Every structure is written in C-alpha cells, then in structure tokens.
C-alpha cells in the first residue's frame, strides 16, 4: 500500500481514477490538488460520502503535510511540469498520465528523477490494450512499407495529436523509414493530409461522444492491415495505473511509457 497525492484531482481522469482507487484499491489517497473546487470536500465532488479531505492548490504544502510516497498526476502539461519537479525535489515518486510535454520538459524531468534516484513514470497511455496495439504495430511495421495513424478523442481534449499517437509514431519510425508518396501531393486545404512525424502521417479527430480510440493503418501491395483499439470508459486505465504505482516504488530512475516495463 502506498500513500498517494492526486494531482489534477478534479479533472475527468482525476475524478474517475480517484473514485476507483478509493473503492477498489489498497492504496491510500492522502491529498487532492487542483486549481478548481479549492476548499471543497473531495468526497462530495465525487458524489460519495464526505472524506474529510479538501481540495488544495499548493502541491508542496500538501506534500509536507501528508508525507506521500507517490504523486499521481492527471493534470495539464502547463502546470504539471512544475509540480512534477516539486514532487521529485521533495523526494516523492511520480506517476504521470499528463500529455503535451515538450521534449525539453521531458528531458528536464528525466534529469531530476535520475539525479535524485527516484522512480518517475510518464505514460502517454495506461490502457493495456493500447500498449498491445503499439507492440503489434511494431511487429507489422517490419512487413509493410506505408503506415498512417488516426486517433479519435472527445472534443474537450486540449492537445493534438495525442501522446499515444506520438509514441506510436516514435516506435514505428525507430524500426523503419516510412516510404514517401509516389506522387507530388497537393493539399487543397492546408493540413488535410494530417500532421507529419518523420514521414508518418497522424490524423486527429475531436468529437463529442468519443473517449479514446486509435487506428494504425498499414498499406502494402494489394492489401492493407488495420489495427484498432477503443476505450469506452476511463476504467480501462485502472489496471495500467495500478501496475505503474507498484513499479514506480521499485524504480530509481525515469521511465517514459509503460511498454518499457511491460514487454
């Protein structure tokens, strides 16, 4: 069992994961940090009985008061970067599902984590199914010369493309070079062919009713292969989060992506 502070507690992911951890986990949630609903009892925010713990907006003060072992972060990159560094500098391990960090920010977090010999996991996706999709895509990439990625999310997601799509493109580009188009393409509407990551096109869809979905489509001579993963509920992330919470206590270094620990 670990003592955990939830960062970004009042967001959709923060609320869903907090409720599941409170109901189905041996871990103890000792603090809740967010910039909204400050001063309110977190149990009432979740629609359950009062917890006797209110939402606070200063992570360092919460750490000093509650002495946690892990900060679990589902906030936004704009604030998460500073707060992750605060946690590590105060000798608290971090598991983060926040996306949208720059490469420079990730490198800084890695440096601070390693310098303090503290486990820190930043994972673009905690869904075991999504991680398996990426693994299968790596296998398929050895046999197909063309690939594109389509990711679908709810219309309130602020960053595009998703961290999972970027991670997938990174994995694919590390083992193969995407073949350029056989023709000179002309975009009648700029951006209509999607974003480009090292020759791999990524397309982002944002619509109400969606949660999180991704397709990796491979094309070859006379055939295509489509790999798809769908998340219908944020509960799908719980198994991966529990796995990360266990593993981060064993780590003394930075890890990006659960795939390094799973496979």
Swiss-Prot record:
Pathway(s) this gene product operates in, as recorded in its UniProt entry: Amino-acid biosynthesis; L-lysine biosynthesis via DAP pathway; (S)-tetrahydrodipicolinate from L-aspartate: step 4/4
UniProt source species: Carboxydothermus hydrogenoformans (strain ATCC BAA-161 / DSM 6008 / Z-2901)
Assigned EC number: 1.17.1.8
Function recorded in the entry: Catalyzes the conversion of 4-hydroxy-tetrahydrodipicolinate (HTPA) to tetrahydrodipicolinate.
Keywords associated with the record: Amino-acid biosynthesis, Cytoplasm, Diaminopimelate biosynthesis, Lysine biosynthesis, NAD, NADP, Oxidoreductase
GO annotation, cellular component aspect: cytosol
Listed CDD domains: DHDPR_N (cd02274)
Active site per UniProt: 153 (proton donor/acceptor), 157 (proton donor)
InterPro entries per record: DapB_C, DapB_N, DapB_N_CS, DHDPR_bac, NAD(P)-bd_dom_sf
Record gene name: dapB
Annotated protein name in UniProt: 4-hydroxy-tetrahydrodipicolinate reductase
Family membership: Belongs to the DapB family.
Domain of life: Bacteria
């Amino acid at each position: 069992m670990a003592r955990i502070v939830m960062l970004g507690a009042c967001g959709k992911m923060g609320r869903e994961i907090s409720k599941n951890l409170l109901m189905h986990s041996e871990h103890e949630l000792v603090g809740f940090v967010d910039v909204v609903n400050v001063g309110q009892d977190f149990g009432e925010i979740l629609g359950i009985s009062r917890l006797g713990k209110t939402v606070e907006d200063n992570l360092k003060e919460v750490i000093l008061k509650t002495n946690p072992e892990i900060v679990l972060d589902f906030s936004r990159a704009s604030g998460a970067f500073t707060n992750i560094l605060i946690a590590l500098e105060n000798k608290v391990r971090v598991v983060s599902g926040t996306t949208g960090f720059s490469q420079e920010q990730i490198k800084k977090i890695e440096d601070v984590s390693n310098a303090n010999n503290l486990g820190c996991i930043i994972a673009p996706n905690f869904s075991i199914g999504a991680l398996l999709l990426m693994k299968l895509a790596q296998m398929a990439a050895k046999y197909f010369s063309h690939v594109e990625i389509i990711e679908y999310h709810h219309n309130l997601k602020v960053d595009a493309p998703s961290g999972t799509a970027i991670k997938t493109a990174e994995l694919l580009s590390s083992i193969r070079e995407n073949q350029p188009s056989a023709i000179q393409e002309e975009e009648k509407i700029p951006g209509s062919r999607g974003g480009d990551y090292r020759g791999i096109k990524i397309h982002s869809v944002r619509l109400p009713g969606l949660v999180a979905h991704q397709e990796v489509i491979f094309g070859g001579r006379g055939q295509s292969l489509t790999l798809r993963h769908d998340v219908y509920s944020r509960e799908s992330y719980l198994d991966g989060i529990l796995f990360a919470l266990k593993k981060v206590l064993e780590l003394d270094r930075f890890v990006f992506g659960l795939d390094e620990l799973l496979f």
